[in-house]
Amino acid sequence: MAQWPEKEEEEQPMFGEEYTGYIPSYLEKDEPCVVCGDKATGYHYRCITCEGCKGFFRRTIQKNLHPSYSCKYDCCCIIDKITRNQCQLCRFKKCIAVGMAMDLVLDDSKRVAKRRLIEENRERRKKEEIVKTLQNRPEPTGAEWELIRMVTEAHRHTNAQGAQWKQKRKFLPDKIGQSPVAPTSDGDKVDLEAFSEFTKIITPAITRVVDFAKKLPMFSEQLPCEDQIILLKGCCMEIMSLRAAMRYDPESETLTLSGEMAVKREQLKNGGLGVVSDAIFDLGKSLAQFNLDDTEVALLQAVLLMSSDRSGLTCMDKIEKCQETYLLAFEHYINYRKHNIPHFWPKLLMKVTDLRMIGACHASRFLHMKVECPNELFPPLFLEVFEDQEV
């Protein structure tokens, strides 16, 4: 004698009293399930049904449960929202009667294959969207191309040795910068011989940053001299650090300073820069992955130069607008270049933050160098640029 079946567990508890998830647009408002009359959620196995009846029908077919179903009342049960769990046989028969298709229920292997196909299609659509988005991103206008050309030329004319830096560099001898002698108050040490070597190249390096800025019409023609000086003092270390970081060589693990002197991390650190050395070397390693061209480096420098938050500026609004102009041209140029790195533009902008941090750390570090190193070792231009900076 057939036993009364256990009460069927619903598949809906996750939805609460009423399913409130995605409802297809082809359904009428509050359209009923053709099996039990509950609120339908879509077209399932050729019929418009609720989640509960969809799940019941799928489980029944997948697990081949229907041969074991029985009815206590000669298959005359009325199936509605309240009674649907009381008789599995009558519920299943009604599913068949209203047209639910057994052949559309997938077994485990087919279900896995279908999910994989859905996932592959989803990924394909994502890639197509990315390509479409990239194709639709604006590229530089005619005016922006002219601005980009001027900034790039300014950089190339003031970037020592240009693309030949590897052939023309000279390595600082290992014996220099490896034996620090003067302890500083923050626990680091300064090798005076290395410090002396670095000061020999600092003046031309600073001069090249000044020349770069003066070649930009927005800087030299639109801003008062006082603001020009403040901007140059603020960005000088940042731009020199960027130029050095772009000449990081992973094979020799060196940075080439001012296009001529290749130094190791410890040499730069012991020569006065301390922890700032680590930050510049780390930046060099990171930037190597970006494969930046001259134009991108030039535009980065222009963005650093036109920082309207430097203390003491009088034309902040004008400087901010100048920076926005460079940023927009920069973004459009990045769109034109079509890099393969995800989120390339925001990641590159984070390097501006890193360079600003390097500049701030160097301002603090400069105070230690002033205390620990003989005053005669400091070139006048070095003192003029970095003295009286906010820490």
Swiss-Prot record:
Stored SUPFAM superfamilies: Glucocorticoid receptor-like (DNA-binding domain), Nuclear receptor ligand-binding domain
Domain named NR LBD: residues: 143-388
Superkingdom of the organism of origin: Eukaryota
Main location, first listed in the record: nucleus
Zinc finger residue extent: NR C4-type: 33-53, 71-95
Presence of keyword Cell membrane: no
InterPro entries linked to this entry: NHR-like_dom_sf, Nucl_hrmn_rcpt_lig-bd, Nuclear_hormone_rcpt_NR1, Nuclear_hrmn_rcpt, ThyrH_rcpt, Znf_hrmn_rcpt, Znf_NHR/GATA
UniProt function note: High affinity receptor for triiodothyronine.
Record GO cellular component, one term: RNA polymerase II transcription regulator complex
Protein name in UniProt: Thyroid hormone receptor alpha-B
CDD domains recorded: NR_DBD_TR (cd06961), NR_LBD_TR (cd06935)
Keyword rRNA processing listed: no
Any single GO BP term: negative regulation of transcription by RNA polymerase II
Keywords: DNA-binding, Metal-binding, Nucleus, Receptor, Transcription, Transcription regulation, Zinc, Zinc-finger
DNA-binding region: 33-100
Region called Modulating, residue ranges: 1-32
Family: Belongs to the nuclear hormone receptor family. NR1 subfamily.
Location(s) in or outside the cell: Nucleus
